Amino acid sequence: MTNLNKLYTLYGVDTRKEKDALKDLLTNHLPKEYTRMVINKLELKGVQVDSQTVRNTKGGISKNLLIFSAIVEVAKEYKIISNQFKEQLKT
């Protein structure tokens, strides 16, 4: 489970706008299979991590800026896809 307040503190998310954006990404746009996607993204950069480390980072149990950045990237990618899908439904 994601502890947003802990993540805000760990990664210096201070403003209301930043907090709202991060909350939206992590709660509404991060897919269920995010761990595998984050691992694959990091492997392309030559970084080896396991799924437990990814989940611990998202949950605020451990701090790893590289992993957290990859988690946010995956969520942003899915937000874009979701918004494109919504636009297609309108036409």
Give short role names for the model-derived ranges.
Residues 33, 40-59, 80:
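Short, basic interhelical loop/turn and adjoining N-cap
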Residues 1-27, 75-91:
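Basic, amphipathic alpha-helix used for nucleic-acid engagement in HTH/winged-helix/SANT-Myb modules
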Residues 60-73:
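Short, basic-rich loop-to-helix N-cap that marks the start of a DNA-contacting helix
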Residues 55-56, 71, 88:
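Flexible domain-boundary/linker segments
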